[in-house]
Amino acid sequence: MPPINTDHLKDIENQLAASRTLEKYQFSSCSRTHIGLVRKKNEDALYIDEQQGLWLVADGMGGIKGGDLASAVVVDNLRSFKRLETLSESIRDIEARFRLANTACRVMFEKRVVGSTVAAILNFESIVVFLWAGDSRIYR
């Protein structure tokens, strides 16, 4: 997977710095996962840190043993996330954490195929960014 190209974000960051009068978004959130009607185990993991502006759902690969563990690894790698000085630095940090989770799963589970998709929202001042890996989606 090629790294995220954040060059275009520098223009947005410059505009944001020039105009600090933009209204900041405020969020109220709650969370819930459900096993659904097909699986015997809930393979979802979620994490919310409103203070850092991060919401994410990791969805373990259904039907493959260990999907619940893989989604937990994704969440564990994001728990210590702290927003950095710029939006592009924060996005690069999240991307690095996604990659670390992928590497951790490969090492932990060796020859077993396990995996998780992830969909995340990052609120950075007045900019909201959607990030994902795999086929999980974010709808408005």
Task: Mark where each language-model region is.
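PP2C/PPM-type serine/threonine phosphatase catalytic domain
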Residues: 1-140
